[in-house]
Design a protein with these regions (language model features):
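Glycine-/small-residue-enriched capping loops at alpha/beta junctions
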Residues: 1-106
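Phosphate/ribose-phosphate-bearing ligand recognition and processing surfaces
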Residues: 80-158
């Protein structure tokens, strides 16, 4: 199935699911996370995340998308960059893979990802991009799913 890179605001992408770069407590973050919460409806999304409670690093959980065009939000818990010596690459690939697996479980035909960990988490964009491309490409070769990698602005392009 297709793997497409697009430049857009992820909150406006008409995919079955979008992915939120989350922290372990599933609390609203800054940047992309804040934009997703605001567009979905902060009160509803906060309540849904509080009901789940937490998620492990490199994993993802699902909530409704509320006010977004998507059906679901997959909250992927992403690693912060600590020099690459603490398993960050494996954790980041795991976050992508876990969200992709949720898409399959929820019978999604499409899912949209931001470039996870590349903003406030400080992951080098080129490395984050390579992990995203490798993980998504491997997955779509074996699964019937359209995946969008949504890059918000030219500065996000590695």
């Amino acid at each position: 199935m297709p793997f497409l890179m697009i430049r857009n605001d992820i909150t406006k992408v008409a995919a079955d699911a979008i992915v939120n770069p989350a922290n372990r407590n599933l609390l609203q973050g800054s940047g992309t996370s804040r934009a997703i919460y605001q567009a979905a409806g902060e009160q509803e999304l906060t309540a849904a995340c509080e009901a789940i409670g937490h998620c492990d690093l490199g994993r993802a959980v699902c909530t409704p998308a509320f006010g977004l065009p998507a059906k679901y939000i997959f909250h992927a818990v992403c690693p912060a960059w600590h020099g690459g010596f603490f398993g960050e690459a494996k954790q980041l690939a795991g976050a992508y893979h876990s969200a992709l697996e949720l898409a399959a479980e929820d019978h999604c035909e499409s899912v949209a990802f931001p470039l996870l960990s590349s903003g406030n988490y400080g992951y080098p964009k080129e490395q984050a991009f390579r992990i995203a491309v490798d993980t998504i490409t491997q997955y779509v070769m074996e699964h019937d799913l359209t995946v969008y990698l949504v890059l918000y602005d030219r500065a996000r392009w590695p």
